[in-house]
Amino acid sequence: MQLTPNKFTLKQLFSSSNEQFVVPGYQRRYAWGKKQQKALFDDIDLLKEDDNHLFGMILCHTGAHTGGLNQSEVVDGQQRLTTIALLLLAMRNKFKAIEMNKKVEEIEGLIHCTDREENILQKITLGELDNPDYKRIFEDSTEEEVVNLNLLNGYHFFSDRLNEFEKEELLSFYNKLINVAVIIRLDASFARDAYKLFESINNRGLRLSPTDLIKNFILGHASKIDQNTLDQVKELWSSVIINLDRIDTNQFLRQYMCMVLGKRVTMDKLVEIFKHYYVNNVKDTDLISSAELYTEEVEFKDEEDENGYTNSEDEDQDELEASEDIAIKTKISIVEFLKGVKEASLIYKKIRLREFDEPKINQKLLNLQRILSFPSYIFLLSLFQREISMKDKLSVLRLIEVLMLRRHICQKRTGELDDIFSQLVSVEDENIVNLVKDRLKEDLPSDEEFEDYFPHHIFKGKLIDRARYVLEQIEYYLINDKGEYRLSSAKEVHLEHIIPQVISTKKAQKEFGDWVTYLGNNAVIKHKKYVSRIGNLTLLSGELNIKASNNPFNCKKDNYKKSNLKLNSSLANHYRQFKFQQVEERGYELTKIASKIWRF
């Protein structure tokens, strides 16, 4: 292993006019936020001129030195290096603003490099996703077009902090930044050495994400095969990262493995299970050492996804054995394997962003998102790779919609859902609708249970969108819609609380009327129990909502009568008053309808 560790000041690190640091496309986007940016800035600011401060380390894969442009691939440390670049850009523009032109020229020399033809280039280039944004900031051009706000916000944070300095403070900070603080640079001549070092170095520092560990494992294996394979693997992994832009790659890989194995995989076990499955199914894995297969016991924090799910329950299953049981008859190449991952990532993107060509599919996916059906994506990854009819796909999505709504309403354990949808992957294409229905029936709450829970279900917080979905579906049922009618967006049609959400404050009484007196004894206590139930909710246009919110129920009725929705006409015509008893009555009426809508 040929390694060259060196300690540099930033001035020394960026001194070579023909070296360019390249953050490869397979790396994730720039992700540092204000917390990390502030820590870096404060570390420099608090330094004394005779102190030493270690920025950290960067790991580079370097080729043979030439007389032209030498590109060093940043294998590790891209977040820190990019942050330093943003700080230098902010300093350049600050010096420019106060007309310290020599300092401007000095920084220009640090942030630029030249090729053999003397073309002036960026000293640091980012991956395909981030470099257009970085270039806009670098060239001080249109900020409105910047997509990655971490880059833009970082630049503005540094600019704001620098603007607080007097001239002498600014010069002192600049000197400490480029001449006092140091960074360790570790160069590896061979790609296999760089990827091997990457994981071992980070095991002693900040914990890597499962995506980082899996990426490094795959690149390390590819580097041991040949350069052509490594180049193809880098390109394929870059495509995966691009496909999953703004999507949690850790969750994609976890759900992908659930689909492949047909069993639940937790985030804690993801890397280990992936490695074992990979070794059993990909060619040339005899090149991988046992040390590379070993995954240090690290407890990955089970962060909630946007739908509120975690995957930390039921840890007693032997997931590792499952990965060893699933092995294809003939091993495939690493390139073929990654082509499969790339295809799955594209489908996952279409699922998450609702980007299929068929609008009806996208509408069903929106319904699932509003219900909060994240675990179902395990099976949907499989479903959308199947050669089955559009009609069958829509029918299967409808079955999942019914299952998820009923289970949520009946407060069934979410920890069971990964198992349910992982096992569903094994159903055959032929007669798929009936097969899925038969499987899901086992986990579907009964009519009796659903009707017992539905009128008392609390729709608030993250569940507001679920309430809107439920009321929309009831409205479609009431008008006997055949899929041709769609309510306006949430911006135009809002969720309306018939009894207002707040009734006891002076502001609420002034704005909404004296609901406390109107509702009678124990109004405030009962209000908390009833206000977020389905019986107290309806849909109303923005204009009507504003008017209605300023009136007691009798005045609200006048506005409900003006609404084109069946929900509101029945509400206005059926109820002379609307108190807690009426919330219960209406809840039971809507329950009867719901039981007919959400059934197999």
Predicted regions and their residues:
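Short, amphipathic alpha-helical segments that act as regulatory/interfacial helices
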Residues: 41, 85-88, 198, 377-384, ...
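Secondary-structure capping and boundary motifs in well-ordered enzyme cores
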Residues: 72-80, 175-178, 186-193, 210, ...
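Betabetaalpha-Me/HNH-type nuclease active-site subdomain
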Residues: 42-70, 426-568
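Short helix-capping/linker segments at secondary-structure and domain boundaries
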Residues: 94-98, 205, 224, 385-393, ...
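Active-site-adjacent bridging/hinge elements
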Residues: 11-18, 51-68, 167-175, 344-358, ...
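A cross-family structural signal marking well-folded subdomains
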Residues: 211-214, 221-475, 597-599
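Generic hydrophobic alpha-helical scaffold/packing signal
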Residues: 198, 381, 397, 401, ...
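Glycine- and hydrophobic-rich flexible loops that cap the catalytic core of alpha/beta enzyme folds
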Residues: 2-284, 550-599
